[in-house]
Curated annotation (Swiss-Prot):
Species, as recorded: Treponema pallidum (strain Nichols)
Gene name in the database record: infB
Protein name: Translation initiation factor IF-2
Assigned protein family: Belongs to the TRAFAC class translation factor GTPase superfamily. Classic translation factor GTPase family. IF-2 subfamily.
Segments of this protein annotated with the region Disordered: 1-41, 112-219
Biased composition (Basic and acidic residues): 32-41, 153-165
Residues annotated as binding GTP: 337-344, 383-387, 437-440
Length: 842
C-alpha cells in the first residue's frame, strides 16, 4: 500500500469502511502550527522526518507497487485509525524513509530485528502471562513484547520515540494498564519515532533451533582444530591397523634401541620390554640392545633381522636407469702396486708431469685423481699409495674403479702389497691389467713375475689366460702407448655407460682443509651431472656446491660422470670413501644429515669401552696398564686415517696407544689445550704445522709436538716411545762355572763345596745352579764364598775357593756349579705382542 502526505492537519482513511485488505492509500496532513504539538516534522521539500503510522490489520494488508520505487518489499500504511494518536496505539510500525514523486515510501528493510526475540520458548511465554489480564503474547519477547503490549508510562504528550535498532537500554518503568503508551526511557523533550522491526509478526525461534545455530557457529570458528583432531583420529586408526602386521624382515644397525625396534616391527615397546624381561633383561624403551639380542627377540615373531650400515639405514632413493638414455662415460682406472714399484712415475710419464718429485720420501701418501685425454678418449686415473699403512685407501680405490692397473717391478717381483692389491681387485670384481715396470734394469726378470702372478690366478693371455700384460719403463717412456691401448680396449669390452639426466651421485676420494677455501673434498662422479648450486649429502654432512674445480685447478660449472673434481661448500669433514649424492631440496639434505649424525653419535657411544666389575678385577690383577695418548693432525682425511690405524696396531696388553683426537688441519690452540689437560699426551702432526699462537701456547704448557712428512717415520718413532713404557724383562746372565773337587763337612753349618773356577767368575749372593749329569738338581743363592780363610766377594777363573749354597748340602765330587745373575733387559713391542699371543694360546 502507498501512503500519500498532503497539507491536511488530520490523518484520515480514504475509505473508512473498507476492509484492511482493500485499503490502498492513506492521506496524512499536517499544518505548520501542528509542529509545535509534537507532530512529525515536514521539511520544506515535503519529506516527512520520523513519521510513524500503524494500523491494526498490517498482517492482512495488501501491498501495492509504488511507481518508480527502487526498493522491493515496500508497503503502505494500513487504514485502521482516524487520528495519529489512535494510529500510535499498537500494531507493526513502519518508517517513511524516501520519497518517490509526491509519495512517501515506507521501507521496512532498514529496521533491525529484535536481538532478544527467541530467548524464551512459546510455552514459557504463555505461562509467564497466564495470570495476567494483559493480552496473550503474539510471539515476541523482551522489549518488543513490552512495546507491543503498550509500553511504559512516559511524560504526557510525548511522541513515540523508542528505537529498537539500538538494542536494549534499560531503565524502564513498570507497565501501566490502560491506553497504550509509547515505550522508551524516561526523559524530557520530543523524540523521533522508532524504526520498524524486520520480521514483524513472526514468532521467535525455539531453543532447539537456537542451539543448532550455536553448534554451527562453534564448528565454523574451530574448523581448523576439528580438522586436525579428525586427522589425528584417522592416523591413530591407521597405526592400530599397522600394529597388527609384523614384517617378515627388518634392517637394523649393530645396536638398536627397544623403541626403534618396536617401531620397525609394528609392535608396542611395552610388549618387547616384557619379552626381554622374560629373557632376564631389565631394559627401558630408550635402552639399546645388540644385534644378537634383537635377532633372538625378532625370531619369536617370525621376523628376520638384517644388519645394515649407517648409510643403508638412511638411504636416499635414486632414480633408476631403466627408462633413461644412457651415454658412454670414460673409464675410471686405479693404479695399484707395492711401494717404490713406480706407480706415480708411470702416471707422470703418461701425463707428462713430475708429481713424484714433489712427494716426501718419494712415496705417495694419499689418493690422487687425474683425467688424461688420449686420441681414443678420456681416462680417469686414481693413484693409490703402496705403503702398508694405506690399506684402506687401496680398498677404496678398488671399490670405485672400473679397471685396475697392477704395477709390478721386474726386478723386485711380487711383494706383500702386490698380493694385497690383487685381493682388493678380486673382491671388487674388476678386471686387472698387469704392467711390468722397470724392464730397462739389468736384473729385470719379467718371466719370473709372470710365473708368480699366474700362481696367484693372473694367467697371461699368451699362456691361455685372460689377463693382459704390458711391459713398460716409466723412466724411459717405453710401452706407455700400449698400456693406454689396453685400457681403452678393456673399456670398450665393458661398455661403460651412465645416466646423465639424474641427480649426481659419487664417492668422496679425499677431504682436507684448505686455507682460505675451507673444507675441500675430492669427488668422483659416478652418474648424473653435478652443478654449482646443487644441494647434497656427503657422508653425514650436508651442503651446497659453491664451486667446482677440475684436476688442473680450473673452475668449472658442472662435472659429468667419471670426472674427478674438487668441490667447496661442505658443512663438515666427510670421511674418504663416503657416498656423495645430490638431493631435491636443502630441507631433505639437512634431514638426512641430522639423522646420520645422530646414528653416528649413537654408534660411537656404543663403541666406548665401559668398565665392568669383571674388567675392573682383571685390570687389578694385571696391574695398571700404561697408556700412550696422542693427538693426530694431518693434511688430508685419508692420511689421518692411515696414521691412526698404523699407530693403533702398536698397542699391546701392557701399553695401549689411544688416539684421543684426530682431525684434518693445522695444529691449533684447541689441540694444545686438549693435550695440556693430560701430562702424557703427544701431538703428532703429519704434513701440517702449528699456528703461531699454538706454538707459543705449546711452549708455555710444555706440550710435545712431533712433526712428520713420511708416515713410516712417524710409526717408527711412536714405536720407540712405546717401547720405553714397557716394563723391562729380567734375563738370566751366566757369570761363570766351577767344578766341585772336594766336599767339606763343617759342624753346625753343613757341607761346603771346594771348587775350581773353570771360566768366568763366582760371586757372592749370585744365583748358582747345581748340575749333575746335565740335570739341574738345585738352584739357590751363594751364601758364602771363601778364598783360603778370607771371605771374598768374587773369585775369577783359575782359582780355587769354597762355596756354600743356601739350603743345599748334598754336594758330590764332579758336580758342576753355574753362577748367574738376573739383569733387566729392555723389551720390544714385537716381543710383547708375541708373549701376549703365546699367553692367549696357552
Amino acid at each position: 500500500m502507498v501512503a500519500k502526505v498532503t497539507a491536511a492537519r488530520r490523518v484520515s482513511c480514504a475509505d473508512e469502511n473498507r476492509t484492511p485488505g482493500d485499503a490502498s492509500q492513506a492521506t496524512i496532513s499536517a499544518a505548520p502550527e501542528d509542529k509545535k504539538q509534537g507532530f512529525p516534522d515536514i521539511r520544506e521539500d515535503g519529506v516527512a522526518r520520523g513519521v510513524s503510522a500503524s494500523c491494526g490489520a498490517v498482517q492482512n494488508a495488501a501491498s501495492a507497487q509504488v511507481p518508480g520505487a527502487r526498493t522491493p518489499g515496500v508497503i503502505g500504511v494500513p487504514v485502521a485509525s482516524k487520528t495519529v494518536e489512535e494510529a500510535r496505539g499498537g500494531g507493526a510500525k513502519r518508517v517513511i524513509t524516501k520519497r518517490v514523486g509526491g509519495v512517501f515510501v515506507l521501507d521496512d528493510s532498514a529496521a533491525r530485528p529484535n536481538r532478544k526475540a527467541g530467548n524464551l520458548a512459546s510455552g514459557a511465554r504463555l505461562s509467564r502471562f497466564s495470570r495476567s489480564d494483559r493480552q496473550r503474547s503474539d510471539g515476541f519477547s523482551g522489549t518488543q513484547a513490552r512495546a507491543n503490549a503498550g509500553g511504559v508510562r512516559r511524560g504526557e504528550g510525548r511522541p513515540f520515540a523508542r528505537d529498537f535498532s539500538r538494542g536494549s537500554t534499560g531503565g524502564y518503568r513498570p507497565a501501566v494498564r490502560g491506553p497504550a503508551r509509547p515505550a522508551g526511557r524516561v526523559g524530557s523533550g520530543p523524540r523521533g519515532p522508532a524504526p520498524l522491526q524486520v520480521g514483524a509478526g513472526k514468532p521467535a525461534q525455539n531453543k532447539r533451533s537456537f542451539r543448532g545455530r550455536k553448534q554451527q557457529t562453534y564448528q565454523y570458528q574451530h574448523k581448523d582444530r576439528l580438522e586436525l583432531e579428525e586427522k589425528l583420529l584417522q592416523q591413530k586408526k591407521k597405526n592400530k591397523e599397522k600394529l597388527a602386521a609384523v614384517p617378515r624382515s627388518v634392517e637394523i644397525m649393530e645396536s638398536v634401541s627397544v623403541a626403534d625396534l618396536a617401531k620397525k616391527m609394528n609392535l608396542k615397546a611395552s610388549e618387547l620390554i616384557g619379552k626381554l624381561f622374560g629373557m632376564g633383561m631389565m631394559v627401558t624403551m630408550n635402552q639399546s640392545i645388540d644385534a644378537d639380542t634383537a635377532t633372538i627377540l625378532a625370531s619369536e615373531y617370525g621376523c628376520e633381522v638384517r644388519i645394515v650400515s649407517l648409510y643403508d639405514e638412511t638411504i636416499i632413493e635414486s632414480v633408476g636407469d631403466e627408462h633413461a638414455v644412457l651415454r658412454a662415460r670414460p673409464p675410471v682406472v686405479t693404479v695399484m702396486g707395492h711401494v717404490d714399484h713406480g706407480k706415480t712415475k708411470t702416471l707422470d710419464a703418461i701425463r707428462s708431469t713430475r708429481v713424484a718429485e714433489g712427494e716426501f720420501g718419494g712415496i705417495t701418501q694419499h689418493i690422487g685423481a687425474y683425467a688424461v685425454s688420449t686420441p681414443k678418449g678420456s681416462i680417469t686415473f686414481l693413484d693409490t699409495p703402496g705403503h702398508e699403512a694405506f690399506t684402506m685407501m687401496r680398498a677404496r680405490g678398488a671399490e670405485i674403479t672400473d679397471i685396475v692397473v697392477l704395477i709390478v717391478a721386474a726386478d723386485d717381483g711380487v711383494m706383500p702389497q702386490t698380493i694385497e692389491a690383487i685381493n682388493h681387485a678380486k673382491a671388487s670384481k674388476v678386471p686387472i691389467i698387469v704392467a711390468i715396470n722397470k724392464i730397462d734394469r739389468a736384473d729385470a726378470n719379467p718371466n719370473k713375475v709372470m710365473t708368480r702372478l699366474a700362481e696367484l690366478g693372473l694367467a697371461p693371455e699368451e699362456w691361455g689366460g685372460d689377463t693382459m700384460y704390458v711391459s713398460i719403463s716409466a723412466l724411459q717412456g717405453i710401452g706407455l702407448d700400449l698400456l693406454l691401448d689396453a685400457i681403452m680396449l678393456q673399456a670398450e669390452v665393458m661398455e661403460l655407460r651412465a645416466n646423465y639426466g639424474c641427480c649426481a651421485e659419487g664417492r668422496i676420494i679425499e677431504s682436507r682443509i684448505d686455507h682460505g677455501r675451507g673444507i675441500v673434498a675430492s669427488v668422483i662422479v659416478r652418474r648424473g651431472v653435478l652443478r654449482v648450486g646443487d644441494t647434497y649429502v656427503a657422508g653425514v654432512y650436508s651442503g651446497r656446491v659453491r664451486a667446482i674445480f677440475n684436476d688442473q685447478g680450473e673452475k668449472i660449472q658442472e662435472a659429468t660422470p667419471s670426472m674427478p673434481v674438487e668441490i667447496l661448500g661442505l658443512e663438515g669433514m666427510p670421511n674418504a670413501g663416503d657416498p656423495f649424492q645430490v638431493t631435491d631440496s636443502e630441507r631433505i639434505a639437512r634431514q638426512i644429515s641430522l639423522k646420520r649424525q645422530e646414528l653416528r653419535r649413537y654408534e660411537n657411544a656404543r663403541n666406548v669401552k665401559r668398565i665392568t666389575l669383571d674388567k675392573l678385577y682383571e685390570s687389578i690383577e694385571k696391574g695398571s696398564v700404561s697408556e700412550f695418548k696422542v693427538i693426530i693432525k694431518g693434511d688430508v682425511q685419508g692420511s689421518v686415517e692411515a696414521l691412526k690405524q698404523s699407530l693403533e696396531k702398536l698397542s699391546t696388553d701392557e701399553v695401549q696407544l689411544r688416539v684421543i683426537h684426530s682431525s684434518v688441519g693445522a695444529i691449533n690452540d684447541s689441540d694444545v689445550m686438549l693435550a695440556a689437560a693430560d701430562s702424557n699426551v703427544t701431538i703428532v702432526g703429519f704434513n701440517v704445522r702449528p699456528t703461531p699462537q699454538a706454538a707459543v701456547l705449546a711452549e708455555r704448557e710444555r706440550v710435545e709436538i712431533k712433526k712428520y712428512t713420511v708416515i713410516y717415520q712417524a710409526v717408527e718413532e711412536m714405536e720407540r716411545a712405546m717401547e720405553g713404557m714397557l716394563k723391562p724383562s729380567l734375563k738370566e746372565v751366566v757369570l761363570g762355572s766351577a767344578e766341585v773337587r772336594k766336599v767339606f763337612k763343617i759342624p753346625k753349618v753343613g757341607s761346603v763345596a771346594g771348587v775350581y773356577v773353570l771360566e768366568g767368575v763366582m760371586k757372592r749372593n749370585a744365583i748358582v745352579h747345581v748340575v749333575r749329569d746335565g740335570i739341574v738338581l738345585h738352584s739357590g743363592k751363594v751364601s758364602s764364598l771363601r778364598r783360603e780363610k778370607d771371605d771374598v766377594k768374587e773369585v775369577h777363573s783359575g782359582f780355587e775357593c769354597g762355596v756354600g749354597v743356601e739350603n743345599y748340602f748334598d754336594f758330590r765330587e764332579r758336580d758342576r756349579l753355574e753362577c748367574a745373575e738376573m739383569k733387566e733387559v729392555s723389551r720390544k713391542l714385537k716381543d710383547a705382542a708375541l708373549s701376549d699371543a703365546a699367553r692367549l694360546q696357552g
